[in-house]
Amino acid sequence: MEGDSRAATASQYQPACPTRDACVYSSCYCEENIWKLCEYIKTHNQYLLEECYAVFISNEKKMVPIWKQQARPENGPVIWDYHVVLLHVSREGQSFIYDLDTILPFPCPFDIYIEDALKSDDDIHPQFRRKFRVVRADSYLKNFASDRSHMKDSSGNWREPPPEYPCIETGDSKMNLNDFISMDPAVGWGAVYTLSEFVHRFSSKNY
């Protein structure tokens, strides 16, 4: 019965944005895509911004496998240096992941995303095990800054075309992306979790 209740709640969930296509999106700039999604949620008042989190996925080696990505929609994973998604923990106790690069539903119920896109660390070599820096959306909007220099090669050419809007910066910084990618709990904002800790903290099954 609990499973039926969760499914019913998920089916009644109203997404925080109209469609995937309505979101601001630039390939390979996932950190900015999610910042823009946080900004959209803040200005449209459908959900409290405090219910939403930016989630950076990386590890010490900057090699994290994620399945069901548009860059490789077959059975194999994409190995990213880092990836960023949005987590919404609704007042009804359901959690949803917004991943603009997945072939899974958008948004995707948390537990489905974990099962299909992240799978388990048990069968993954330790160097590939994922960690998660979870930052409240309001803090992310206030503190994140990027001058996009990480997307230029040694000759100063763009590896991927940058977004058309100006770089995101704060009064204190023009570039602090590495503080968000870092999985050192002593650095940056938010809290850092292992996969099992992340699931235990945010899984809809725990409500």
From Swiss-Prot:
Function, in words: Mediates the side-chain deamidation of N-terminal glutamine residues to glutamate, an important step in N-end rule pathway of protein degradation. Conversion of the resulting N-terminal glutamine to glutamate renders the protein susceptible to arginylation, polyubiquitination and degradation as specified by the N-end rule. Does not act on substrates with internal or C-terminal glutamine and does not act on non-glutamine residues in any position. Does not deaminate acetylated N-terminal glutamine.
Species of the source: Rattus norvegicus
Subcellular location: Cytoplasm, Cytosol; Nucleus
Any single biological process term in GO: protein modification process
Keyword terms: Cytoplasm, Hydrolase, Nucleus
Subunit (UniProt): Monomer.
GO cellular component: cytosol; nucleus
InterPro entries linked to this entry: N_Gln_amidohydro_ab_roll_sf, NTAQ1, Prot_N_Gln_amidohydro_ab_roll
Catalytic activity annotation: N-terminal L-glutaminyl-[protein] + H2O = N-terminal L-glutamyl-[protein] + NH4(+)
Protein name as catalogued: Protein N-terminal glutamine amidohydrolase
Lineage: Eukaryota, Metazoa, Chordata, Craniata, Vertebrata
Enzyme active site: C30, H83, D99
EC number, UniProt record: 3.5.1.122
Superkingdom per UniProt: Eukaryota
Protein family (similarity comment): Belongs to the NTAQ1 family.
Main location: cytoplasm
Gene Ontology molecular function: any one: protein-N-terminal glutamine amidohydrolase activity
EC supergroup of this enzyme: hydrolase
One of the Pfam families matching this protein, by short name: Nt_Gln_amidase
